[in-house]
Amino acid sequence: MSAAAVAADDSEHLVTVVVPALDEEQSISSCLDCVLGQTHQDLEILVLDGGSTDRTRAIVEDYARRDPRVRLLDNPRRTQPAALNTAWPEARGAYLIRIDAHATVPPTYVEQVVRHLATGDYGGVGGRKDAVGFTPTGRAIAAVLGSPFGVGNSSYHHATESALVDHIPFGAYPIDVVRELGGWDESTPVNEDFEFDYRVRQSGRVLLLDPGMAIAWEGRQTIRLLARQYRRYGRGKSKVVRKHPSSTAVRHLAAPAVVAAFALALAIAPWRPRWSLLLVAPYLGVLGLGSAIVAARLPSAEERRAVLPALAAMHLSWGVGFWEGLLGAEVVQRAR
């Protein structure tokens, strides 16, 4: 289909936007405002609330009273994949777009999604994920998340050109693809998006990353919260690796390898201190170099000081979480 024909058809496509939310009173209004302000106005917006104890529900209900395109649905199982699985059977749109409650997108985002998916060439499309920081540490974390030293070759964090990829953040899919694949796997409450994208690719379809569709995403603002987040990510990845071994890429094994090296170094340090140092020296060198390169782009000393601990927290927490998930699952499997 030509670009002109696709553009002419844009207004004919109802799009379902799914917004999982839990205690997001600080950000839900910004999220809904950006969706309602899209150039493509043929929308339904399903907000899936996982049992918020703050004002999230009241805020969404107010939006729903003012605009019938907004609907509030309950997500009693609370997780992200459960929210998506509650939403897609309700969806009336030809395309389903996930936008989390702590994210915002530019006004042409939905229009660009429709333009890409209406060609029929893609099983899904997504944009570059730009972390946003509100504190000096938060801005350092955002810089790390936008650097290959932090996220390796995960192009959706730092891509500048469109490309076919193995994973898209906050993905948008034809609803027929979602129905065919049966939605998201609720046994992987973390990393469920990667697992779904793997099945999309296994079905013979391709995924497009368009960095022009930038997603502003509120990153963690403290090292402690970042470490907790990446430990969960590591556990989630281990579940996907066990379920789909062929989905594993080299970048997924880098952090677990570093953690294994540190564990071995600690074990042999009393007897072989030099060998112990040799085991971890390569990582420490890369950590120092990467921190210096990322920090050089930041304006304040406070931001620059937070880069090294942010990088280390991401790598080591992810690796620890991966081993916890992998070895914990192995223990459970043997006990059965």
Predicted segments, located by residue:
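N-proximal low-complexity "stem/linker" segments adjacent to membrane-targeting elements
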Residues: M1-L36
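Glycine-rich, basic loop-to-helix element that forms the pyrophosphate-binding segment
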Residues: N75-A91, Q112, V165-I168
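Conserved donor NDP-sugar-binding/catalytic core segment of glycosyltransferases
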Residues: P107-R139, A214, E218
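Cell-envelope/extracellular polymer assembly enzymes that use nucleotide-activated donors
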Residues: H13-T16, E44, E195
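Membrane-embedded multi-pass helical conduit in multi-pass membrane proteins
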Residues: V258-V332
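Catalytic donor/gating beta->alpha subdomain of glycosyltransferases that bind UDP-sugars
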Residues: D185-T248
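A conserved acidic beta->alpha catalytic loop
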Residues: D49-A58, R77, D100-P106
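Short aromatic/hydrophobic "clamp" motif used to bind/position activated sugar donors
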Residues: L96
